[in-house]
């Protein structure tokens, strides 16, 4: 834990770039009001904490933001995006704000190094989505939106990661959590994050986070986090085990 704290403190003080995430999805359920996020990355140095508190934030009943690719720690662009959402900005308005007001000192406050996925529910309860992928984020990179979700990734093996995550999310019936877990399974193959190809896994760390509309910000319905795993151990398999245990599946 001390070594993780030292790493995070060093990154914060020096303003070094840190590629913290590769593939993620953020989504809303306009029927239930649930909002959730899931993602994974082939990073080292994050330890048991993983990336869940670095790249995603959710306002229960309102919306959520994933901020990834090259980020500062703490993730000031994520914090600013959430503040804009709290002030009433739509996902597309938040993207516009972030592009004009990049607050990460790494790479000279250049939004071309960033990647975002944003979803919310408007005043009528209808879903809205937006995304952004900067030209200087690592290839393969893409963000893709549906009516109630945004899936995004960078430093991916290829487009298949995004294709599979989108297809699994759309084809899965059940709760928002079920759909997010299925989306993650779509990226469960060697090299989904290309840095993990040699280890035969998709990533080194993964998470799943879901809020009901009436949850307190510090008390989500579901928070599953798989911290950094050794080479050869598949985090999405472990995430599935945690999810099955949460549901009581044998």
Language-model segments: which ranges?
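Positively charged n-region of N-terminal signal peptides that target proteins for export
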Residues: 1-4
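Bacterial N-terminal signal peptides
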Residues: 6-16
């Amino acid at each position: 834990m001390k070594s993780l704290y030292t790493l995070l403190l060093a990154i914060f003080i020096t303003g070094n770039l840190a590629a913290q995430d590769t593939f993620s999805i953020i989504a809303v359920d306009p029927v239930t009001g649930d909002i959730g996020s899931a993602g994974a990355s082939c990073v080292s140095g994050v330890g048991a904490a993983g990336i869940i508190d670095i790249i995603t934030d959710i306002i229960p009943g309102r919306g959520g933001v994933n901020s990834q690719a090259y980020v500062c720690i703490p993730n000031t662009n994520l914090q600013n995006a959430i503040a804009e959402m709290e002030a009433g900005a739509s996902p597309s308005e938040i993207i516009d704000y972030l592009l004009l007001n990049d607050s990460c000192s790494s790479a000279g406050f250049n939004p071309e190094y960033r990647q975002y996925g944003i979803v919310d529910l408007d005043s009528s309860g209808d879903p809205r989505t937006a995304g952004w992928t900067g030209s200087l984020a690592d290839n393969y990179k893409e963000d893709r939106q549906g009516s109630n979700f945004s899936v995004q990734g960078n430093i991916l093996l290829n487009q298949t990661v995004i294709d599979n995550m989108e297809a699994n999310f759309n084809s899965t019936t059940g709760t928002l959590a079920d759909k997010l877990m299925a989306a993650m399974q779509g990226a469960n193959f060697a090299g989904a994050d290309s840095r993990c190809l040699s280890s035969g896994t998709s990533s080194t760390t993964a998470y799943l986070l879901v809020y009901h509309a009436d949850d307190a910000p510090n008390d989500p319905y579901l928070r599953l986090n798989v911290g950094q795993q050794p080479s050869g151990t598949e985090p999405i398999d472990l995430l599935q085990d945690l999810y099955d245990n949460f549901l009581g599946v044998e």
